[in-house]
């Protein structure tokens, strides 16, 4: 019997969500820390670059939970390539929790990815406060100056 990897649960949850919304993927590239999917929809083609963290890195007294996503040199090269080729690109970051049912994901669109790459970021910290409906993506200057990404955003 084939065994499943931890990443199968996280990537599978995102793919299941998309399929339930009538969006069918084709796997383009698979690796230990990321997966890249290509989608064809009635609104056009797009690439989805997925990464996950299985648990938050911190839970502090301010009520924030944070996940840090590191990008390898290969990841950054691939993202830059997609942007240069003017591909429709989304980056999905799966924010796992110890109770899998409490896990969430956020989606960065190409313009936001371009901003992060332009800032020389090799990692992205995603945080959310307990009662908020937006993720914070730190670009520089801490949480107060962070990009605010709605939790209900589509790919």
Residue ranges: model-predicted function:
Residues 10, 20-27, 31, 79, ...:
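Positively charged, aromatic-accented nucleic-acid-binding surfaces
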Residues 54, 97-99, 114:
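Short loop/turn segments at secondary-structure transitions that flank enzyme active sites
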Residues 1-44, 56:
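Acidic-basic catalytic patches of nuclease active cores, encompassing PD-(D/E)XK
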Residues 33-37, 70-83, 93-94:
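Short secondary-structure capping micro-motifs at structural edges
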Residues 103-155:
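Non-catalytic C-terminal interaction segments of nucleic acid-processing enzymes
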Residues 81-108:
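Nucleic-acid nuclease catalytic cores
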Residues 37-72:
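Conserved catalytic cores of phosphodiester-cleaving nucleases, focusing on short active-site segments
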Residues 71, 76, 84-89, 103, ...:
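Electrostatic, structured charged patches in enzyme active sites and in nucleic-acid/phosphate-binding
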